[in-house]
């Protein structure tokens, strides 16, 4: 059938375009507001939380590894998330009930690489940058 092409078809074209927009995945996600509700951070880039436990997440095939992660309960809304702890041996800096700063992990609302279901990474532990702890530039404060 094709689209209307004649004179006085602007209203029909405009209405059709308005309806068809909702079949576009990105448009729907941006305009319904449900993606924002589902995001544990809300509209923020980082969030603070309390470490509940240390967990090992098995990497997806064909890799064989246990990725070191922590379960974190966010302070602002009480939601529980799993966050990846980057760098070698950095899991040793963390203990349960520590306060951590968590950021996104690259792809918006998607898991990264071979770590299934993990969408966040730890940036700070006990108000000290994880990178500074790893490089030995700073030490973990005594609690």
From Swiss-Prot:
SUPFAM superfamilies: Nucleic acid-binding proteins. Its main location: cytoplasm. CDD domains: Ribosomal_S23 (cd03367). One of its GO terms (biological process) is cytoplasmic translation. Keywords: Cytoplasm, Endoplasmic reticulum, Ribonucleoprotein, Ribosomal protein. One of its GO terms (molecular function) is structural constituent of ribosome. It comes from the Eukaryota. Transmembrane segments: none annotated. It is found in: Cytoplasm, Cytosol; Cytoplasm; Rough endoplasmic reticulum. Component of the 40S small ribosomal subunit. PANTHER family: 30S RIBOSOMAL PROTEIN S12 FAMILY MEMBER (PTHR11652). Belongs to the universal ribosomal protein uS12 family. This is Small ribosomal subunit protein uS12. The lineage of its organism: Eukaryota, Metazoa, Chordata, Craniata, Vertebrata. The gene is rps23.
